[in-house]
Amino acid sequence: MAKRKVTWTKAAITQFDKIIDYIRQDSDQNADKIKDKILNKINHLSDDRIVHRKDPYKKNNDGNYLYFEILKYRIVYYKSANEVFIIRIKHTSMEPKRY
């Protein structure tokens, strides 16, 4: 079975960079650990066997908008037939917004 390509939206890249930069203000080591763990989990989304929950904050979600949480961060992604799009990354303490 072919693996899906993982693509980040510009918004998700910006959010992720801000998160890592914020953590780096206190600890380079913690920033690197968190960055590596999140990236590792995201890279595994290309595997078809990975199943996460449907994103309840997506309006009219046909089931292709999914999410998972890791290290108090909520990652939302869209899963198409050939590709996974990373949509957003937010800390779980932030109020989720419908989109």
PLM regions: where:
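Enriched for short, Lys/Arg-rich terminal
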Residues: 70-99
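Basic, Lys/Arg-enriched alpha-helical interface segments
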Residues: 1-62
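Short acidic/glycine-enriched loop/turn segments that link adjacent beta-strands
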Residues: 61-64, 72
